[in-house]
Swiss-Prot record:
Residues 105-326 are annotated as: Domain III, AAA+ region. Domain I is involved in oligomerization and binding regulators, domain II is flexibile and of varying length in different bacteria, domain III forms the AAA+ region, while domain IV binds dsDNA. It is found in: Cytoplasm. One of its GO terms (cellular component) is cytoplasm. Signal peptide: none annotated. Gene3D superfamilies: 1.10.1750.10, 1.10.8.60, 3.30.300.180, P-loop containing nucleotide triphosphate hydrolases. This is Chromosomal replication initiator protein DnaA. The gene is dnaA. It comes from Spiroplasma citri. GO terms for biological process: DNA replication initiation; regulation of DNA replication. SUPFAM superfamilies: P-loop containing nucleoside triphosphate hydrolases, TrpR-like. PANTHER family: CHROMOSOMAL REPLICATION INITIATOR PROTEIN DNAA.
Length: 450
């Protein structure tokens, strides 16, 4: 039984109810409609405010009982004037028109199953999956940050696709690029008060709102005011919001402090550049999907994974260049070798051209902490100097895989135990302090030349 059929049945029962006079039925019930049914909530539209008063005064419980008898579900009932719904529908239509390209079949492949997991993105993927499986109950809002090309948009659409799969509908989730939201908001702000108010509630029909690249709304105060209203409404109603950005919330400029505070209210989690193993898996998956995996030697893929792993788009760009050159210069099905790859990129700025050394690590860490290498190499127990020294030792261990004794020698004759304890302290701090983890990842990218 669909919504229309259900409401016809409800009205039929009310028309036969002796406690409902013909006048009440004809004046207030006959022209009502059941507008939406979502979870345990029903929204009924009427043509007059008097009708809403009549329903709330004497018919609310009666309708609940009829609905429960017909469906077995105990519904909460709310009422709205039909004219307000029509305004809201007009706004929703405008939103759908401006964002219709966001729902192309292209994004159907952006699923959790197709998301290549690694140390750089595992936590973000797990958090995104958790909110998709239990909207509004786990982390709200979920704020995913990271540089362009690391998989933020993929995760948003993976949430969308998972929710659609669970609920067998495409109407519970709304994906919006932040700049598109800005365009819609600017158009709405140039219209009357009633349209603005309708816009504020137009997203109430969704249970999950996905906003991509929120940094694009920076310094747009009036637009941010509208977004803040919608954001707060979602949080208060336990509806899920997921936001992506190229920066950690506290590093975003152009937003009021209260908005930044709200962004940080739930869970903020970062995406880092893929490590070598993850980059290699991404390459293999994409080439397999294109039926091109057999065209590349293992060594050629390893070269690409090592030198173009700052983000997924650079990996894809390298592959496209090689496939183009293969079409132009090689026989059909001839393997692309390491020599081919090195020749193709002989003039390209490769990430690993500059060798990482203990000296380079010390300099970049010292610069990041605004101290000198001399201070780092001293016996100073000042907090930031100690942390910089420990972090430099940590990078020598994790990026160069140097023995503890050799690292100790690099740092003025520190013994094996001191170095090992320093590395453990950094690892423990990373696991318990997300801001420190954010700093460590930023310094690592500088060291690796990304």
């Amino acid at each position: 039984m669909n919504t229309k059929e259900l409401w016809i049945e409800v009205k039929e029962i009310l028309s036969r109810d002796e406690s409902v006079s013909p006048e009440i039925y004809n004046y207030y019930i006959s022209d009502t409609n059941l507008y939406t049914v979502s979870d345990n909530n029903c929204l009924i539209t009427t043509k007059s405010e008097i009708a809403i008063g009549v329903f709330e005064a004497g018919l609310n419980e009666k309708i609940k009982n009829i609905l429960k008898k017909l469906t077995g579900i105990q519904y909460n009932i709310s009422f709205e004037l039909e004219k307000n719904i029509n305004k809201q529908a007009s706004v929703i239509s405008k939103i759908d028109t401006l964002t219709e390209n966001n729902n192309l079949a292209y994004y159907e492949n952006y699923t959790f199953e197709n998301f290549v997991r690694g140390d750089s993105n595992h936590e973000a993927m797990q958090a995104a999956l958790a909110v998709a499986l239990d909207l509004g109950k786990k982390w709200n809002p979920l704020f995913i940050y990271g540089d362009s090309g690391l998989g933020k948009t993929h995760l948003l659409h993976a949430i969308e696709n998972k929710v659609n799969e669970i609920y067998k509908t495409n109407n519970r989730v709304k994906y919006l690029k932040a700049d598109e939201f800005g365009k819609i908001a600017m158009d709405i702000l140039n219209q009357g008060h009633e349209i603005i108010e309708a816009f504020k509630t137009s997203y109430d029909i969704y249970d999950c709102l996905l906003i991509d690249d929120i940094q694009l709304l920076a310094k747009r105060n009036k637009t941010n005011e509208l977004f803040f209203h919608i954001f707060n409404s979602y949080i208060e109603k336990n509806k899920q919001i997921v936001i992506t950005s190229d920066k950690y919330p506290d590093d975003l400029g152009g937003f009021e402090a209260r908005i930044i505070s709200r962004f940080s209210y739930g869970l903020s989690i970062g995406l880092d550049s893929p490590d070598f193993e993850t980059a290699l898996k991404i390459l293999e998956q994409k080439l397999k999907h294109q039926n091109n995996l057999g065209l590349f030697s293992e060594e050629s893929l390893e070269f690409i994974a090592l030198n173009f792993n700052s983000d997924v788009r650079k990996l894809e760009g390298a592959i496209k260049r090689l496939l183009f050159l293969a079409v132009m210069n090689k026989k059909p099905n001839e393997i692309i070798t390491l020599a081919d790859v090195e020749k193709a990129f002989k003039n390209a700025p490769l990430q690993n051209n500059e060798k990482i050394t203990p000296k380079k690590i010390k300099q970049i860490v010292a610069d990041s902490y605004n101290i000198t290498i001399k201070a780092m190499m001293s016996k100073s127990r000042v907090s930031n100097v100690m942390q910089a020294r420990q972090l430099a030792m940590y990078f020598c261990r994790t990026l160069l895989d140097e023995p503890f004794t050799r690292i100790g020698t690099e740092f003025g004759g520190k013994d094996h135990t001191t170095v090992m304890n320093s590395v453990k302290k950094v690892e423990a701090h990373i696991s318990t302090n997300k801001e420190f983890k954010h700093l460590v990842n930023a310094i690592r990218r500088k060291i690796e030349g990304r």
